[in-house]
Amino acid sequence: MNAKPLAGLRVLDLSRLLPGPACTLYLADLGADVIKIEDEAQGDYARSLQPALFKAINRNKRGMCLDLRQTDGRATFLRLVERADVVVESFRPGVMDRLGVGYEILRERNLALVYCALTGYGQSGPYRNRAGHDVNYRALSGQLEQSGPAGGAPDLSNFQVAD
């Protein structure tokens, strides 16, 4: 049997909800060793969704809990970064820096690290700190106004394209 194309690649997944976990799911399906890292206190918000969805989006991944606000959690994460190829995170801009594990710190530990920051509106610009979820994008684009009856409340779909 042929090895999968990303076999040997290690990914640290700090993302939550759906976009980041979907991204790392594809990497895992292609053979990457993905370690999903959840906050000890809250975990991934997607755990509050249907259990089958959470399990499906996180299949083929290993998991662990770390509190990056604590010295021990940060130290463990930084040791993992030394042996990782990719870090994927979905915090608002500046959160990783405030936790003491921003790009510059991680780069000092691993010059070859690929750092992927998934945000709704990018790392700079006027909307950078806004919440970034499907309903926000639909409202901002005007699509939400076009859903539902004319002159009535918008129809909030259960199908979230961008979240």
What do the PLM-derived regions correspond to, one by one?
Residues 1-163:
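N-terminal helix-loop segment corresponding to the beta1-alpha1 unit
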